[in-house]
Amino acid sequence: MPELPEVEVTRLGIAPHIQGRAVSAINVIDGRLRWPVPKSLTKALPGQRVQAVERRGKYLLVELETGHILIHLGMTGTLRVLPSSEPLKLHDRVTLEFGKLSLRLHDPRKFGAVLWHPKTCLLYTSD
């Protein structure tokens, strides 16, 4: 299982490549992860710019204009930044497209997670 230092190294590795870029598409190749990948992702994300890439514990938070994508790497998951033209590998589960770049979740054991939390959800209310 990727431990906290590996998750931080992953954050530091992907942030310079995706921060400030607009999501052009999201492809859910196999959404059967620890929790099903929300179908709303494919409609909610395109056109939104990545504001920041943060970490809370072992979760990566990709901050967009209208919410956060929460990513957990599970037991054996990795995130890779690749050219969009690079062929998919067998265990690639979710791909975020940024024009000519792709951010791919590669998770052989399917214990990872990709979740969407819009800023309108209870997480963001200030009472």
Predicted features by range, described:
Residues 1-126:
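Structured catalytic/nucleic-acid-binding cores of DNA maintenance enzymes
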